[in-house]
Amino acid sequence: MPRRAARAALPLPDLVVLVLQGGGALGAFQAGVYEALIDLGIELDWVAGISIGAVNAAIIAGNERDQAVGKMREFWEGVSSALPSLPVVDNDWAREWTHMAAAGQVAAFGVPGFFIPRFPPPAFAERQTPEAVSFYDTAPLVATLDRLVNWDRVNNGKVRLSVGAVAVETGNFRYFDTQCDTIDARHILASGALPPGLPPVEIDGNWYWDGGLVSNTPLEHVVETANKDMLVFQVDLFPARGDRPHDMEEAWSREKDIRYSSRTRRISDGLMRRRKEHRLIDRMLEKLPAEYADLPEVKAVRKMVDCKALNLVQLIHQPPAWQTGARDFEFSRSTMEVNWALGRDAVEAAMKDGHLLADSIAEGRSDSFAVQSNALRPKAEPDVS
């Protein structure tokens, strides 16, 4: 049952979570989503991220609620400062050309406050060192995070933070979580250390790479470790649906969308299906004769069943026609502003039909929603037959 209400007349359950996936420069979309949620009076209890999502999550958890948007704006204006806004031409071909040129500049010169090209290059570095296995140095991001994030607040504040990374030597996925770990800039860098561009990060004697190599969304960690009714806003940076590509640029873009969104969709659909299956099992257990209630097998099944309500809202970045497969490493100011505005628009579109979500929360149901055709719609029911 809801425990509080946002200014958007949305009842909020025990746990409100923002889930942020990886996607480089597309993280500005996440910032727009967060700003819109704050404007609606929606308070977060937990933020979980991978890669650029971990960066945004750390800024959220590491600042007062009324300061976090400003700090996020400072971060995104900083990383886009080398490529200021150019005159916007109302022509997709011209915008695509400037978009690709901006991405090329990032590849050649790096991103201010984020990463710079390594010199000397990795071929001249000592073998089996971070310098030998990456083209860029992320030391600037450490300084940026230490300036924008209050780590004491991250580890002792009200908003729980979780970030995901993968161990290089074992391939095992790991979440660093303020509920059991002390998090600092190293953990954020580890979550976004995408090889071979960015270097692995050593934590407790182990090297870690970008968590997106295994899973680009921390939704599974959130759902499986929580034991409360929850509302989850999942920000997806790569759409599952798209048009048939016309050329190589569009093929590159579509391939990237499918590669990342398919794993995210499989996880989210699987979790919702499991939650609905648990509801059915719980109803079946209630119908068992009383003499079976104390059987070890029945107790074990009852313990496994999770019937807490889960409402999932997927806010999906829908790229303009001129954004190509380079959009996750195109950090120009004009594109950053476009992505930020798209994030705000996604939340506003969802709240136009907020009564659908409000009804589901108030009734204690588990449902999944997504913004489609500029409106919030329930996703198709997972088949539990």
Question: Model-predicted segments: where are they?
Answer:
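Hydrophobic/aromatic beta-strand patches that form the interior of the parallel beta-sheet core
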Residues: 48, 164, 231-235, 311-315
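Small-residue-rich anion-binding loops in enzyme active sites
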Residues: 1-16, 159, 166-169
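Short active-site oxyanion
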Residues: 43-46, 206, 310
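Active-site gating loop/helix substructures
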Residues: 122-228, 234, 241-254, 328
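Acidic, Ser/Thr-rich peripheral helices and adjacent loops at domain boundaries
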Residues: 246-288
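Extracellular/periplasmic catalytic domains that process cell-envelope and extracellular macromolecules
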Residues: 11, 155-157, 305-308
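Patatin-like phospholipase
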Residues: 12-17, 24-133, 139, 145, ...
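C-terminal helical/tail subdomains of lipid-metabolizing enzymes
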Residues: 125, 132, 140, 145, ...
